[in-house]
């Protein structure tokens, strides 16, 4: 029994010392990151600037001491980065794979809204995007959910209605303006039913007649009010 314990202790000591030697060697080998590869599904992240920032951050670090998790945590704060993977490839390469946010709308003419309904960046350049309007940015989620339903109903009925803006007021009533300059009042109740009713009505009206419609008021229980342009 004692011999077995001695053998085990010797074996354990050997492995421990070997590990220390390997770690010491890794930390003292002059091996650094010389290549940084960045791929992205969009073009809103400036990869050249990103490479410069990363090089500055890790320039004095041994390849084995570079921590991909720390780089990932730092870069995820970039407004356009939705997801990022960072990993090393021996002997001297750092690889980054970026998934960018997709801007689908502009909130109150000042901020961008992404494909998940999140406000993520101040608008700097004019963009031809759908507009969301509300008194409070907390209402963006309600507008986004309404927008997704509107698109779903269009897809189910094989129809396309180009939207200029969606607005919600303080009592959560929805108002939509199309790019054909039709205004639609949906109110705040029975949204699914009213959307379905509107889609059926819209597809039954010929294009030239749509151009003569000022607004559709869907806030009726069984019908709709249509006002023509003068």
Tell me the role of every PLM-derived stretch:
Residues 47, 51, 55, 68, ...:
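Extracytoplasmic/secreted envelope proteins and their assembly/folding machinery
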Residues 1-6:
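N-terminal positive-inside, membrane-proximal cytosolic segments immediately preceding the first
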Residues 40-42, 98-102, 134-136, 178-180, ...:
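Flexible glycine-/small-residue-rich
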Residues 94-170, 176-177, 183:
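Extracytoplasmic segments of membrane-associated envelope/inner-membrane machinery
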Residues 189-230:
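Extracytoplasmic/luminal low-complexity segments enriched in Pro/Gly and acidic/polar residues
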Residues 27-126:
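Terminal hydrophobic membrane-targeting helix
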Residues 29, 76-82, 152-162, 206-211:
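Short secondary-structure junctions
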Residues 9-27:
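Hydrophobic membrane-insertion alpha-helices, especially the h-region
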